[in-house]
Amino acid sequence: PAHPKRIAVPAMVLPNMVYALQGNAENMVSIPPAAYSGWEMSILKDLAPELEDVDTTMVNDDFSVNVEALADADVDLVLNWDSETDQAEQLKALGIPCVLVSSAKDMDGLKSLVTMLGDALNCEDRAKQVTDWYDETMDYFNSKADEVAALSEDEMPRVLHFQNVH
């Protein structure tokens, strides 16, 4: 649909990307339980409080969906991984469009994914803004490569990175 009003997003990382492109999550009606857990433990809880009551029973952590439940919920778009072709056919048979996307394996793949989601969500301008920002940022850092390479060991900045993965 040109302007999806009720989206189900079984693919784990895509709810965050949908939010980033739309600027809200008001039209997301179902996300996987693991994505909901991620929402609870992140800044998205403050940015997208509308996800507090989102359904987590129609889509599963293994990307599978309850086709009948999605139809009953009047879902008008499903965003999922390209490995879910059988489910996509079932959804299409019920009149529910399904956009299947590839998991990004590199930054070019991620930019393609953002562009494809922008097209599906009617957020093409925002998707272009995101990919342009990435290109500009990479150009900036690449322009500093020679400068950084010329630094001595003592001049190199030190960074400590903490990461908590559940």
Where in this protein do the model-derived segments appear?
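Conserved H-X4-D acyltransferase segment
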Residues: 1-23, 165
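Extracytoplasmic
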Residues: 2-5, 23, 62-65, 86, ...
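A structural signal for short loop-to-beta-strand junctions that line the ligand-binding cleft
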Residues: 3, 48-61, 99-112, 116
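Structural recognition of the beta-strand scaffold that forms the well-ordered cores
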Residues: 8-11, 29-32, 77-81, 98-102, ...
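Solvent-exposed loop/turn segments at secondary-structure junctions
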Residues: 13-16, 34-37, 77-78, 83-87, ...
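A short, structured surface patch at a secondary-structure boundary
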Residues: 15-69, 73, 77-79
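Extracytoplasmic substrate-binding proteins
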Residues: 87-166
